[in-house]
C-alpha cells in the first residue's frame, strides 16, 4: 500500500526525518514507536500528504502520493486519519464530527445513518453520546468518536497518532483491547504512533523503533527484545520494564 523511497524532512535546521526507505505491509498493523521528537508524527503526516517531502517520494498503491488538488483529496478519502488528542471540532456534536465528511460528499441521509449505526456498534460507543459535544464526553469517548470519524468513509488505511494518549490506565487498557479487535475484524492497513512499548507489542504486527529521525530497528516486539541492534534499543526496552515492586513506567 505504502512505499517510501529516500524520504526526508527538515524543519529549518532541524532534521526531523533522515532519508528513509521502507515498505509498509498491506492489511497489517505497523507501529511507529520511539521517544518524543523522534519523527513518528512527522512520518505519519508525510503518509497522509499533510507535509511535503524534502527529498524522495511516498508511493501509494504504486503511484507517487499527490501533493494537492482533487488527486490528493481522492487519496485522503481512502485514508482515515485520527489526530493526537482526537482533533474533534468543539462546536460540533459527536455525530456531526463523525459524519462531517459524509455530509461534505453529499451522502444520502439513509446511507449516513446506516454507516453511523455500524460504527457505533463496532466501537461500542454509547449512542446517547452522539448528541453531546466533545467537552461533554470522557477522554475514552472522544477517542472513540475520533476513530469513528476516521472510519466513516470505510478507508483502506488508518493512520492513528497516539490514539490512546492521555487516558487513564483502565480506559487505556479497555481501548487497547477494542482496537486490536477492530483491526482484526476490519483487516485494514494500519499505521499507529505510540511511545509505549507494551502497547506497540500488543497492537502491532510490526514495530518500527525510531530515534532522532531514523528507524533504528524493525520487527516484532519479541525480536527487539531478543536481538536488540544497539544500546539505545536495549535501554529503551529496559526503561519501560516494571520496576521491582512497582507498576512500571514509560520512557
Positions of predicted regions on the chain:
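Helix-to-loop junction immediately C-terminal to a conserved catalytic motif
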Residues: 48
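ABC ATPase NBD coupling module
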Residues: 65-80, 104, 227-228
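Conserved ABC ATPase "signature" region
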Residues: 110-128, 181
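Conserved ABC ATPase signature
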Residues: 133-137, 141
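Conserved catalytic motifs of ABC-family nucleotide-binding domains
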Residues: 154
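Conserved ABC ATPase "signature" C-loop
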Residues: 212-213
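ABC ATPase "signature
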Residues: 218-219
Amino acid at each position: 500500500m505504502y512505499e517510501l523511497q529516500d524520504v526526508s524532512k527538515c524543519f529549518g535546521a532541524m532534521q526531523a526525518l533522515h532519508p528513509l526507505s521502507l515498505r509498509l505491509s498491506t492489511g497489517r498493523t505497523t507501529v511507529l514507536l520511539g521517544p518524543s521528537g523522534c519523527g513518528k508524527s512527522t512520518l505519519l503526516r508525510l503518509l497522509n500528504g499533510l507535509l511535503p517531502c524534502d527529498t524522495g517520494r511516498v508511493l501509494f498503491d504504486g503511484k507517487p502520493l499527490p501533493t494537492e488538488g482533487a488527486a490528493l483529496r481522492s487519496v485522503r478519502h481512502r485514508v482515515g486519519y485520527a489526530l493526537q488528542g482526537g482533533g474533534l471540532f468543539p462546536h460540533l456534536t459527536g455525530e456531526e464530527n463523525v459524519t462531517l465528511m459524509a455530509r461534505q460528499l453529499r451522502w444520502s441521509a439513509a446511507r449516513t445513518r446506516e454507516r453511523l449505526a455500524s460504527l457505533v456498534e463496532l466501537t461500542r460507543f454509547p449512542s446517547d453520546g452522539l448528541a453531546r459535544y466533545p467537552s461533554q464526553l470522557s477522554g475514552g469517548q472522544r477517542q472513540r468518536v475520533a476513530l469513528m470519524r476516521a472510519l466513516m468513509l470505510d478507508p483502506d488505511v488508518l493512520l492513528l497518532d497516539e490514539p490512546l494518549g492521555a487516558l487513564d490506565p483502565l480506559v487505556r487498557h479497555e481501548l487497547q483491547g477494542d482496537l486490536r479487535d477492530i483491526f482484526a475484524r476490519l483487516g485494514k492497513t494500519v499505521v499507529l504512533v505510540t511511545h509505549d512499548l507494551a502497547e506497540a507489542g500488543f497492537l502491532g504486527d510490526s514495530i518500527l523503533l525510531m530515534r532522532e529521525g531514523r528507524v533504528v530497528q524493525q520487527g516484532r516486539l519479541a525480536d527487539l527484545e531478543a536481538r536488540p541492534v544497539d544500546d539505545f534499543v536495549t535501554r529503551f526496552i529496559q526503561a519501560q520494564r516494571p520496576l521491582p515492586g512497582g507498576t512500571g513506567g514509560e520512557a
